[in-house]
């Protein structure tokens, strides 16, 4: 009986250690990269903690772009060295080299942006670097999940919250307007062909996308007004 108790205690202790290690590992690998809506929200904040989060986010993005630059450089070299070429070597390599150059440029801009927010987090005066507007708008950041969007919509109370939702709905409205144009073009292409009935389906999608764009635009305007009223 005593031996059985010891075995149970050892097993329980081992399970606790494994759980602790797993939690520590998860904490260590947690990504500092924010979603696009979080970036848009925090950019409007002067809070040191928010700026520290932005600094970590942009620094992590810079490393990602730097890795992509290295990858595209390696691809360019591989294309040039390959004995089997299905595309002109110079053309394919040039594409990869240009991508690497753009990746490097983005990485450098993001490092400057990370340093800017690091200074703001420390309370220092700093000037916004040039060319950072796309990254402040969420370029490079992942889209928020459904749960994250629902949580933000449910607790939105500050101007920053409403501004982030305004940006989200503006982006959604733009996407729906692009869908209107796409489905309109497809409807035109189908008319006069043997499958002209497909144009009717495209017309329905045009109408649906138009309504979606209208609602998203209205939601963006509402959050814009709420953001202004809360200042």
What are these regions (language model features)?
Residues 46, 116-192:
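Extended amphipathic alpha-helical interaction segments
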Residues 9-21:
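Bacterial N-terminal signal peptides
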Residues 37-42, 68-95, 146-150, 177-203:
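Short E/K-rich amphipathic alpha-helical oligomerization segments
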Residues 25-74, 78, 94, 98-101, ...:
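Immediate post-signal-peptide N-terminus of mature secreted/exported proteins
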Residues 55, 96, 166, 202, ...:
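Hydrophobic packing residues in well-ordered alpha-helices of helical domains and bundles
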Residues 1-6:
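N-terminal secretory signal peptides that target proteins for export/translocation
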Residues 96-124, 176, 208-231:
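Amphipathic alpha-helical coiled-coil segments
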Residues 51, 55-58, 62-65, 69-80, ...:
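Non-transmembrane amphipathic alpha-helical segments
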